[in-house]
Amino acid sequence: MKKLLYPILLLSTVALAACGTTEAAAPAAPQPGTSGINITAQQNRVRAQKVDAVANLVPKAVRDTGKLTVGTTGNGTPPLSFRADDDKTVIGVETDIAQLVADVLGLELDLQATSWENLFLSVETGQYAAGFSNITVTEERKDKYDFATYRKDTIAFEVKKNRDVTVKEPKDIAGLKVGVGSGTNQEQILVRWDEQNKAAGLKPVEFQYFQNTTDYYLALQSGRIDAYAGPNPTAAYHVAVDGQTKIVGTVSGGGQIPADIAAMTKKGNGLAEPLRQAVQSVLTNGQYAEVLKRWNLGNEAVEASRINPPGLPRK
């Protein structure tokens, strides 16, 4: 029987990692869950076939190595890039997509687990050909890196299963007690929403802050907060393993601006286009959808991979 995971997560890990301000930290000790999500080292990943027309686009310097060296923050939070139950093997949606891309390019995936800061440095110096680690496209990052998108950057609102509430726009959170991580991207968005609501004469949001995700979920179950706003992948994973909550709305990680998660490579090295075409290949043939479904992230699917789309604005 597959072993299962009920993660105790740090909210800011994914959110700040996507914004590029901190290293992804390891989750605390897991406890049994009931989701059926495979977190063993034997992943039986979805695989793709080599596509010669795409593989031939890979720069010679990379092609000659026979490997696609990919950096990822392997001590991150489920379901992105995290350690399996052997506490060694790096698994998650990010590694699954990297595997599909390597397959299409006809290269062996050489996955390197590293810190968030070292990931960017190693891609910039060429030590890693690419980074797959929930990396959001930003205008500032585009100065040094090229990007090929493969997932939407999304924030989710999670509530108890018996709550009759939907969150689609600012007025939907007026008067609610909302748990959100201090200093996170989602907090910035909700503070702007709250300011709009108060200007329109609506009740203010009562923001609640806790030390870690476990505390947010305890507050949610006890009724101390009405909703919890956090990274969609984390919320989707928790809904799957816990079974007592539901997602009632999502918003772009850029607020009013669409935000994208992308494979990152050194600017101008010629790898961005083959990365994009590899993503597009598995997107077209359905293997991409299989991977997202496996990790309950179907709502973050993109219709097409793009190179260097508009990113989050400079601060």
Predicted feature residues:
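A ligand-binding cleft/hinge motif common to bilobed small-molecule-binding domains
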Residues: 135-142, 190-193, 221-222, 226-257
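Bilobed "Venus flytrap"/periplasmic-binding protein-like clamshell domains
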Residues: 75-77, 88-103, 135, 153-212, ...
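Extended ligand-binding regions for polar small-molecule ligands
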Residues: 20, 30-53, 95, 103-104, ...
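Extracytoplasmic small-molecule ligand-binding "clamshell" domains
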Residues: 29-132
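Periplasmic-binding protein-like
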Residues: 152-159, 240-280, 298-315
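Acidic, polar ligand-binding/catalytic clefts
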Residues: 108-172
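A structural signal for short loop-to-beta-strand junctions that line the ligand-binding cleft
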Residues: 59, 90-94, 141-151, 248-250, ...
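C-terminal motif of bacterial Sec signal peptides marking the signal peptidase cleavage site
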Residues: 14-18
